[in-house]
Amino acid sequence: MPRNSRLDLLAERLAEQREEGTEAESAPEFLMARRRERRPSGAEGAVEASIYVRGAPAPPPADPADPAEVRRRLEAEPEAVAWIRMDRPSTGRLMAAAREFGLHELAVEDAIVAHQRPKLDRYGDTRFAVLRAAGPGGGADEVRFSEVHVFTGPRFAITVRHGDAPDLEAVRRRLEGDPQLLALGPQAVLYAVADRVIDDYAPAVARLGEAADEVESRVFAGDPEASPRVHRLLREVILFQRAADPLLDVLRRGLEQDAGDEELRHHLRDAADHAEAVAERVDGHRQLLQNVLQVNATLLSLEQNEKMRRLTESDARQADNAKKISAWAAILFAPSLIGSVYGMNFRHMPELGWALGYPMSLLLMLGIGVGLYALFKVRRWM
């Protein structure tokens, strides 16, 4: 089946999915949970296009938003290279570019649906890369993620950005300020975008590191609010790893596929080194937070054990006090019982007429009291 026909079928299927509300189901769960980098649906951004000839900027196309116009410029100038920059494009606009430049329908679908894992795929002479940008978010413990897709072909590069990062205008200025790099062709665009993504990681990584150090101090200081923050930070770091770690694989695959261009390999190797350094720092933050989480759990366990020990000691003291009270109550009860019996003053009580009745009753009270005291003392109730 011709590629344009497959693209038409893809457009119809995506339209049906949007009507049924099932388009987002194909996105990975961990990415669907983080949509704060996305603007409201329907907020389509601008489309820009640049033409370069032998590493130097050329006059832009008359209508940068028309991929057919860009294609005609490339056909008219055999040495020209085009870079089309799309910001949250509509399905129709991306489909139009796909038809003009022969983009593979699977890559186009990924670019439309978005929420993809970082990767580098090759479809014939066209490559498709997914990169996840990251930067400091609104909160102290928050990282803001964006997504950019890069199509590269023999004489063109198309970037599709979902979110506000990376700053593609800064990438354009850098490329135009380095004619030797720009002369390497469309792959230079992929390298420059990836390098910008890696550079943008630095502030976010630094903020995560500061937050991790701060929460570590709070944990050892016994701050009860530290535990939820440790969990939040650890979640941010894990999401950061899922965005940054695959980028290293993307760059390494680019090194393997660009074996013939030594200059480009040099740039990709440098970017891969930076990506590896970022990955190591993020992994260090993750290990630190995991250790802090374990220490926090240990401290909480010790605190709970101490509370239980105090409760046990308190219960034991209460039990001892109850025993002492019960023992004294029993000791005092016997004399009280004897006194109560003989205090009833009935006429026919033989002991009342006995001369030794009074001293004997006192001795009986004292003897029972002493006996009970000795018994409770032996049983350690006193």
For each feature predicted by the language model, list its residue ranges:
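Divalent-cation
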Residues: P2-Q180, L184
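A generic structural signal for residues located within well-ordered alpha-helices
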Residues: E79, P89-G92, G185, V189, ...
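Membrane-associated alpha-helical segments
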Residues: R155, V197, V205, E214-Y342
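Short, charge-rich amphipathic alpha-helices with coiled-coil/heptad character
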Residues: Q180-Q187, S217-A221
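Well-ordered alpha/beta subsegment
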Residues: L184-A212
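Alpha-helical transmembrane segments
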Residues: A194, Y201, V278, I368-L375
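Alpha-helical transmembrane anchor segments
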Residues: I331-M382
